[in-house]
Amino acid sequence: MIIATLAYTLWAAATASATREEANPFTIFHKDAKRLFGPSPTLELLHENKSIPFAHEAGVFIPQDNTLFVTSNRFQDPSTQEQQQQQRIVITKISLPPSSSPNKVKNRQPVRVQVEEVQTRNIPMPNGGVNYKHGILFCAQGSMNTSSGLSFMESRPPYRSRYMLQSYMNRPFSSPNDLVVHHRDGSIWFTDPIYGFEQGFRPRPRLPSQVYRFEPRTRSVRVVADGFGRPNGIAFSPDGRVLYVTDTHRFHGDGVVDDTHPATMRVFAMADAGVPDGIKCDVYGNVYSGSGDGISIWSPGGTLLGKILVSGGVANFCFGRRGEIFILNEKRLLRAKLAPSTKGALLGI
């Protein structure tokens, strides 16, 4: 297995590119992007909440219910005393309307969605999420007095949840950020940076920033990669042989040759606007990542194919059906409609 990292460079393109969103958000750098975008891609607003940044991470589409689950960015809980306001993160469920035919919608009326704040226990400060069995597996970042780890939640009311993992070698995780499930063996791979400590809601870390592999059947947990600055988003290639990890520090290194360990590590690409965050693959093996000016798309070889420009940037996103991409833009939820043949590798629909 190869671990490929996506690092970053900071420059003025984030602002310059974002201003072009309204004119044409779909930017092509390579002819292969035309096939992915289709002849008439669209970008539309699904929901906006001007009060809180409800659409920050996770992005888990449940096809059987046509629902989407997202986690917010941190915000100050107004229900606590002003002098001791606590940071809070909420899970939001968005019930989507039936999807219109991709790329053929003209003079659209505003899309109406139903929005519900999910109340559940055992997922303190939720962040990344992924489809898992009959529900969702979340990264629970934890707090000063609650455990961090991985938590499973049912995707239908009453949204029962439970911890699946809370420690490594009797040491608490720092603040798990994102996760992915290997499609062949069901193992769960996740990143654990120190954001929680840096952002003031977790104790001082007792583990370095690393990538872990958890085997639910045997309860085995092992470190599969280290040496990261801030490991963040994580995704597998469609064949499961390459693991992509977004990081804010460029690095090179070697792993251990083993079926459950990476054989090599390499820098895959550099995000040219802001810090790379969420990362996904399509069924062709192309790599998509959210960053400071929207979503960038690379070929499996690391060639920049195109971008979906979004003012304010994109922390995370997920594929829906037949060319849909749900884009998390903090206080806005957007939907891009690309070619129907452009499908996410995770669900393949």
Where are these regions (language model features)?
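Short loop/turn segments that connect beta-strands within beta-propeller blades
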Residues: S95-S99, E154-Y159, E215-R219, S299-T303, ...
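Beta-rich, blade/repeat-based domains predominating
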Residues: K50-D65, R121-M144, Y168-I188, Y195-G196, ...
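Blade-level signature of beta-propeller repeat domains, shared across WD40, Kelch, NHL, RCC1
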Residues: N316-I349
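Beta-strand-rich domains and repeat architectures in extracellular enzymes and scaffolds
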Residues: E44-I89
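Blade-loop segments of beta-propeller domains
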Residues: Q86-G142, M164-Y168
